[in-house]
């Protein structure tokens, strides 16, 4: 008789069968796919031995090509050859056209203002284009591993907001991939170096790719990866080096026409080739559009010096956020092909006071880290003790009475995280509450960013302060925020998942953080004033209700004194004199103490009516 084969629910009937997983570095300029084989993480090459896949897609009516074949068409068919699509992910069309006015594509806006690119294959959005790149990477992995992938980990810049992260996940699903997790690129690099060299302590991950710059300060200790702080610029990278050098070559060659897309592409290709050559040579010969000349490393350094300085300013801010001095950083990990530029390595070494780590190919280190994490998440290393902690870049909270922001999850809190806080009603008989989710570091709503609004209805009619509403903020491992509000006594609940159509830029995040420090004293005073005004409104609301119910307990003279005190409080509450408001509140309290005592006596007498002393 055959034996029944029984396995644990949700697990393979062959528990020792290795699952196929991959780590994908979906980059602005180039992308890679890596996996763990025989205990070693490695990037996978194409049939020609090339590990990098240019993040370029060329569209035609009958199909498309991805990578090197697509990039070869860039000069001849610029409008249908889409590159650096990662920069468009999660952004509005207006934002893209403002930031990147020289993109050689024809755009249309979707119904919600997101970009659609006109191609020979029709209107395509950044999610679809990214999906085509992911499909090419997945096909490479499937062929190399001789099987379909059980799951992937895809890396994203640390500063990607909710919309950009969600767009990346949507692209993966469109490509037919099961996303195990989105992983911050600097964190992936920390995984790669943490496992290879076993370093413990504080490290800096300096990630300068084609289109983005990220700096992360991390603490590695006994397998725990904790991001202390992040910073960067989602619109700064090696592409900007290329464009500066291309503009310089244009000036030297005397090319005035910017409308010829083919010449534009030739200039950019020449600039990229020159940049790469100047990493090893002191000068390089350039031949473009009939012009021939030499470019020196010194000239190139002069062009990019300001951009490199910008990255170091972000490093300084991140160190300050982490509460760490530069000399406390044990190692500096270099990530991204642009870190091969000698000036970058030199300036970074000077800033941190130590030569940066470059043992792992900076182009491959992120994909390798993602592959290691994917191998764990897919279940190939169930005994792994590695823990990964990322952080949120800006505080999350709610609007409260008076236009104040109550922070629920502070900036740089590790994720995933869930925090709950109790709130209550302001008015008697209030049956609904508006939940306004905020993001930012300032004290007032007007100085922070609105993320979402929703209403909790069906609250039991109670006196002010009687209802208890628990609001829970939950940020998952991908940085996506869910907010739930529930009234405790009835279980009435409402929730929202925050997916803004487009989010903040890194420079705006940095500005918000800087403003919170610059205006700290002013904000505290403004908050104190707002709180005084809210308290004044609460006192007046309560007094109005009390007088409506029990005015008969007062003589005409007593009522006049209380009315005068209330009128004075109502008047000063409109001013910005916090001390005067505080004194007026105290005066109302003083003038109504006897009234409050009489109301209490009345309530006690009513409660005792019909009962004997023995019963009490």
Swiss-Prot record:
It comes from the Bacteria. It comes from Citrobacter koseri (strain ATCC BAA-895 / CDC 4225-83 / SGSC4696). One of its GO terms (biological process) is iron-sulfur cluster assembly. Keywords: ATP-binding, Chaperone, Nucleotide-binding. PANTHER family: HEAT SHOCK PROTEIN 70KDA (PTHR19375). Belongs to the heat shock protein 70 family. Chaperone involved in the maturation of iron-sulfur cluster-containing proteins. Has a low intrinsic ATPase activity which is markedly stimulated by HscB. Involved in the maturation of IscU. GO terms for molecular function: ATP binding; ATP hydrolysis activity; ATP-dependent protein folding chaperone; unfolded protein binding. Gene3D superfamilies: 1.20.1270.10, 3.30.420.40, Actin, Chain A, domain 4, Substrate Binding Domain Of DNAk, Chain A, domain 1. InterPro entries: ATPase_NBD (IPR043129), Heat_shock_70_CS (IPR018181), HscA_NBD (IPR042039), HSP70_C_sf (IPR029048), HSP70_peptide-bd_sf (IPR029047), Hsp_70_fam (IPR013126), ISC_FeS_clus_asmbl_HscA (IPR010236). Pfam families: HSP70. This is Chaperone protein HscA. CDD domains: ASKHA_NBD_HSP70_HscA (cd10236).
């Amino acid at each position: 008789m055959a034996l029944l084969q029984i396995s644990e629910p949700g697990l393979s009937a062959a528990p020792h069968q290795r699952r196929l997983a991959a780590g994908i570095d979906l980059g602005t300029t180039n992308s890679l796919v890596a996996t763990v084989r025989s205990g070693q993480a490695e990037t996978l090459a194409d049939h020609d031995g090339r590990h990098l896949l240019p993040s370029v897609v060329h569209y035609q009516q009958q199909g498309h090509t991805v990578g090197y074949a697509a990039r070869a068409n860039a000069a001849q068919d610029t409008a249908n050859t889409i590159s650096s699509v990662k920069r468009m992910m999660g952004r509005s069309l207006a934002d893209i056209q403002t930031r990147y006015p020289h993109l050689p594509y024809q755009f249309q806006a979707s119904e919600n203002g997101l970009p659609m690119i006109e191609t020979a294959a029709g209107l395509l959005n950044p999610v679809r284009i990214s999906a085509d790149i992911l499909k090419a990477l997945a096909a490479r992995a499937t062929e190399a591993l001789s099987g379909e992938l059980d799951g992937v980990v895809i890396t994203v810049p640390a500063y990607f907001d909710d919309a950009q992260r969600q767009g990346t996940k949507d692209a993966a699903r469109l490509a037919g991939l099961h996303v195990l997790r989105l992983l911050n690129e600097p964190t992936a690099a920390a995984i790669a170096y943490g496992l290879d060299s076993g370093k413990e302590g504080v490290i800096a991950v300096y990630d300068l790719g084609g289109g983005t710059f990220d700096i992360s300060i991390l603490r590695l200790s006994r397998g725990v990866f904790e991001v202390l702080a992040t910073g960067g610029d989602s619109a700064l990278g090696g592409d900007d080096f290329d464009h500066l050098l291309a503009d310089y070559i244009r000036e030297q060659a005397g090319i005035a026409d910017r409308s010829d897309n083919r010449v534009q592409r030739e200039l950019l290709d020449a600039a990229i080739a020159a940049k790469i050559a100047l990493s090893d040579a002191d000068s390089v010969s350039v031949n473009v559009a009939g012009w021939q000349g030499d470019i020196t490393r010194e000239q190139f350094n002069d062009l990019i010096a300001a951009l490199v300085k910008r990255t170091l300013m972000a490093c300084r801010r991140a160190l300050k956020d982490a509460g760490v001095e530069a000399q406390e950083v044990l190692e500096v990990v270099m990530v991204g092909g642009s870190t091969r530029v000698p000036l970058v390595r030199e300036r970074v070494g000077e800033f941190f006071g130590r030569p940066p780590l470059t043992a792992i190919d900076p182009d491959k280190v992120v994909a390798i880290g993602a592959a290691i994490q994917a191998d764990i998440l897919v279940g190939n290393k169930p005994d792994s003790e590695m823990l990964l902690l990322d952080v949120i870049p800006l505080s999350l909270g709610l609007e409260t009475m008076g236009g104040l922001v109550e922070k629920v999850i502070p900036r740089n809190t590790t994720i995933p995280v869930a925090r709950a806080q109790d709130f209550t009603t302001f008015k008697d008989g209030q049956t609904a509450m508006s939940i306004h989710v905020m993001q930012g570091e300032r004290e007032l709503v007007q100085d922070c960013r609105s993320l979402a609004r929703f209403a909790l209805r069906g609250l039991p009619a109670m006196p002010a302060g009687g209802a208890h509403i628990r609001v829970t903020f939950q940020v998952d491992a991908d940085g996506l925020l869910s907010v739930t509000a529930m009234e405790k006594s009835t279980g009435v609940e409402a929730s929202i998942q925050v997916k803004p159509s487009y989010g903040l830029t890194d420079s705006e995040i940095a500005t918000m953080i800087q403003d919170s420090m610059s205006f700290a004293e002013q904000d505290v005073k403004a908050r104190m004033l707002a709180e005084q005004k809210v308290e004044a409104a609460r006192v007046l609301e309560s007094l109005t209700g009390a007088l409506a119910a029990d005015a008969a307990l007062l003589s005409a003279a007593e009522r006049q004194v209380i009315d005068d005190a209330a009128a004075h409080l109502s008047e000063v509450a409109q001013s910005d004199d916090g001390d005067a408001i505080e004194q007026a509140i105290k005066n109302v309290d003083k003038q109504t103490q006897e009234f409050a005592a009489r109301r209490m006596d009345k309530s006690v007498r009513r409660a005792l009516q019909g009962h004997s002393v023995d019963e009490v």
